Regions:
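Hydrophobic transmembrane alpha-helices of multi-pass small-molecule transporters
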Residues: 62-65, 177-182, 207-211, 283-286, ...
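Short runs within selected transmembrane alpha-helices of multi-pass transporters and secretion channels
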Residues: 140-158, 166-174, 195-210, 289-292, ...
Length: 456
C-alpha cells in the first residue's frame, strides 16, 4: 500500500504513526533548534546577549511566517491536486512555491541587511542589548533565502506523504546548527553572530537535501517557470491556503515585538526571562502542531477526492490527540520547570521570574493544542477565510488588546497571564467555527471557497 492508498483507506491511528510521527520529530528538531542558541549564549552568563536573542526572535519568526505562507499553502494545494489527480495543478503549485521563496528571500535579505539598525530600534533594543541585536539581525537577514527556502521545501515535500524526507531535511539542519553553535559561539567567540551564522548554515544544508529528494523522487513536482504560465489563480489559492498559518506566525512576531516593548520597562531581566521561558513553553504546543501538520495532507487528500466522512474522522481524532499530548507535556514541563530554567541561564533573577512565567503559560497549553487542530481542519478542508479569522483573533484582535489591558491593570504580572487568557478565548471561538463548518460539510453546503480549493 503506497502513501496515497494509506491516506485513503489505511487505519487512522496508523496514519498518525506514519505521517504525524515524522512531523513531530521535525517539531522536536525545531524546538532543539530554537533552544540551542539560547543554551550556548546563556552559558556565558551575559543577560544582555540573552535579551538580544529574545528581542530578535520575532525577526526569525517573521521569516518563518513568510515561508509558511508558501510552504503550508503549497502543501495543502499540492495534496488537493494529488487527491484530484490534477498533474498540471501540481506542477504549477510546486513551481510557484520554489520561485516565490527565492524571490522573496532575496528581497528580504537586501532589506534586512540595509536596515538592521533601524529594525533593532523598532524591536525595542536597549543600550546594553542593541549592539548584539544588530549583529544577529544582519547575519540572519543575509541568510534569509536559505532559511525561507528550507521552510517552504520542508512543507511542500509532505504533500504526497513523504514525511521522512521532511524529517531528514529538518534533522540535518538542526544537527549542523547544534554542532556549530559551541564552535562559533564559544570557541571562536562570535556570540550572537555565531548563533545566527549556525542557523543559516544549518538551513542551507537542509535545503540542499530537500531539493535533492524532490528532484530524484517526486517527478510530479516542478521547478520550471513555464509551469506558472496562465496559472495565477492557482498561485493565489496557494497564498490563500497558506495565509492562516502565516498570519498566525507573522502576527505572533508582531505581538512579540509589542510584548518586548512593554517588557523593556521592567529591564533586560524580564525580557530574558520571557525569552527563556517561552523557548521551554513552546515544547507542548510545537508537538501539537507537529501532529496537526503531519496529518493535514491526509485530511486534504480525502476532502479533495470527495470523502468528507473520512476527512472528518481524521480531524476528530487529530483534535483529541493534540489535546491529550499537550496536556501530558504541559504537566511534565511544569514539574521540571526549575531544571529547565537553570539549564539556560545562571542569573538567579532570570530563573526566578522565568519559572513563574513558565508555570502560567503551561496552564492553557492543552487548549492551545486543540486550537491548532481546529485551524488545521479548517485549512485542510479549504475554508481559508475561517482559518485566517482564527489566526487574526488569536495573535492580534485578542492578544494585543489583552496584553495592553492586563499590563495596565496589573503590570508585569498582568503581562505574564496574557497568553493563557488569550488561548482560552481563542479555543472557544475555534470550536464554534469548526462545529458550524462541520455541519455545512455534512449537508453538502461547501460554498465556492472550498469547492475552488478542492479543485485547485
Amino acid at each position: 500500500m503506497n502513501a496515497q492508498e494509506r491516506m485513503a483507506r489505511g487505519p487512522v491511528w496508523r496514519l498518525f504513526l506514519s505521517m504525524s510521527l515524522p512531523a513531530i520529530t521535525v517539531m522536536l528538531v525545531m524546538v532543539i533548534y530554537n533552544m540551542a542558541d539560547v543554551y550556548f549564549i546563556g552559558r556565558a552568563g551575559d543577560t544582555a546577549q540573552v535579551a538580544a536573542l529574545a528581542l530578535t526572535g520575532p525577526v526569525y519568526g517573521a521569516i518563518q511566517g513568510l515561508g509558511t505562507l508558501l510552504g503550508s499553502g503549497g502543501c495543502t494545494a499540492a495534496a488537493l491536486a494529488l487527491g484530484g489527480g490534477d498533474k498540471r495543478a501540481l506542477s504549477a503549485v510546486t513551481s510557484f512555491c520554489f520561485w516565490g521563496a527565492l524571490g522573496m528571500g532575496a528581497l528580504l535579505a537586501a532589506v534586512g541587511a540595509a536596515f538592521a539598525p533601524n529594525i533593532c530600534v523598532m524591536l525595542g533594543a536597549g543600550a546594553d542589548s542593541a549592539e548584539y541585536a544588530e549583529r544577529y539581525v544582519r547575519v540572519i537577514s543575509l541568510g534569509t533565502p536559505c532559511v525561507l527556502m528550507a521552510g517552504v521545501l520542508s512543507n511542500v515535500v509532505r504533500a504526497d506523504g513523504s514525511m521522512r524526507a521532511a524529517m531528514l531535511g529538518n534533522g540535518l539542519g538542526t544537527l549542523i546548527n547544534v554542532a556549530l553553535d559551541p564552535l562559533l559561539i564559544e570557541v571562536l567567540g562570535m556570540g550572537v553572530e555565531g548563533a545566527a551564522l549556525a542557523t543559516v548554515i544549518g538551513n542551507a544544508a537542509g535545503c540542499a537535501l530537500l531539493l535533492r529528494h524532490i528532484i530524484r523522487k517526486q517527478p510530479g513536482f516542478s521547478f520550471a517557470p513555464g509551469a506558472l504560465k496562465g496559472e495565477w489563480r492557482r498561485c493565489l489559492n496557494v497564498l490563500a491556503l497558506g495565509l492562516p498559518l502565516a498570519v498566525s506566525t507573522l502576527l505572533s512576531s508582531c505581538a512579540g515585538v509589542l510584548n518586548n516593548g512593554l517588557l523593556a520597562q521592567y529591564g533586560d531581566t524580564a525580557i530574558a526571562a520571557m525569552g527563556v521561558s517561552g523557548k521551554v513553553g513552546m515544547l507542548a504546543v510545537m508537538i501539537a502542531i507537529g501532529i496537526c501538520m503531519g496529518i493535514q495532507p491526509a485530511i486534504s487528500f480525502n476532502f479533495g477526492r470527495g470523502d468528507a466522512k473520512r476527512a472528518l474522522e481524521i480531524s476528530r481524532k487529530t483534535a483529541a490527540l493534540a489535546f491529550a499530548v499537550s496536556a501530558l507535556l504541559s504537566g511534565a514541563c511544569y514539574v521540571a520547570r526549575d531544571g529547565f530554567m537553570a539549564a539556560f541561564t545562571s542569573d538567579a533573577a532570570v530563573i526566578e521570574l522565568g519559572r513563574a512565567m513558565l508555570a502560567i503559560s503551561l496552564t492553557a497549553c492543552p487548549l492551545a493544542g486543540a486550537y491548532q487542530a481546529c485551524t488545521a481542519f479548517l485549512q485542510a478542508t479549504g475554508k481559508a477565510s475561517y482559518a485566517i479569522a482564527l489566526s487574526v483573533l488569536r495573535q492580534g484582535a485578542l492578544y494585543v488588546p489583552c496584553m495592553y489591558i492586563m499590563n495596565g491593570a496589573a503590570g508585569l504580572n498582568g503581562l505574564m497571564y496574557t497568553g493563557a487568557v488569550t488561548d482560552v478565548l481563542a479555543f472557544a471561538i475555534a470550536i464554534a467555527m469548526c462545529i458550524g463548518w462541520k455541519r455545512r460539510i455534512l449537508r453538502g453546503e461547501l460554498g465556492e471557497e472550498s469547492t475552488t480549493a478542492a479543485k485547485s
